[in-house]
């Protein structure tokens, strides 16, 4: 099991999701549905709190099992929920995975997704031993 990271570049911070994140993550996702629907299979017009709560529950379990690492993307200064980044489909033989991310629409154009991807990739390389 990997310990909970707090990864930051002083602009954003990545951390594990907690049950208390349900409302903030739901608000970020709902705000961004128009942008997310074409790209994220989970995004749909009725996406809401119950699905977010289930997501947070499941990613807690898959984190503990070492199968899927989802991280909250937050503002490093005030903790505002900005989106999510994940390492999935981890291949233990070849030491690689998929990296996915999204950031809330109201913060688009500030380089947050690139920052989140960079921090998550470093987590994969340094903590998970991926190539």
Put a short name on every predicted segment.
Residues 101-103, 109-126:
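Conserved acetyl-CoA-binding loop-helix of GNAT-fold acetyltransferases
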């Amino acid at each position: 099991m990997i310990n909970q990271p707090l990864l930051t570049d002083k602009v954003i911070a990545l951390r594990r999701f907690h049950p208390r994140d349900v409302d903030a993550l739901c608000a970020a996702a709902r705000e961004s549905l128009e942008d997310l629907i074409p790209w994220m299979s989970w995004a749909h017009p009725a996406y809401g709190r119950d699905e977010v709560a289930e997501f947070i529950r499941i990613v807690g379990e898959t984190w503990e099992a070492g199968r899927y690492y989802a991280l909250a993307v937050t503002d490093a200064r005030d903790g505002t929920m900005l989106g999510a980044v994940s390492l999935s489909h981890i291949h233990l033989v070849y030491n690689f995975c998929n990296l996915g991310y999204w950031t809330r629409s109201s913060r688009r154009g500030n380089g947050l997704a690139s920052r989140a991807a960079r921090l998550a990739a470093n987590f994969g390389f340094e903590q998970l031993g991926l190539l």
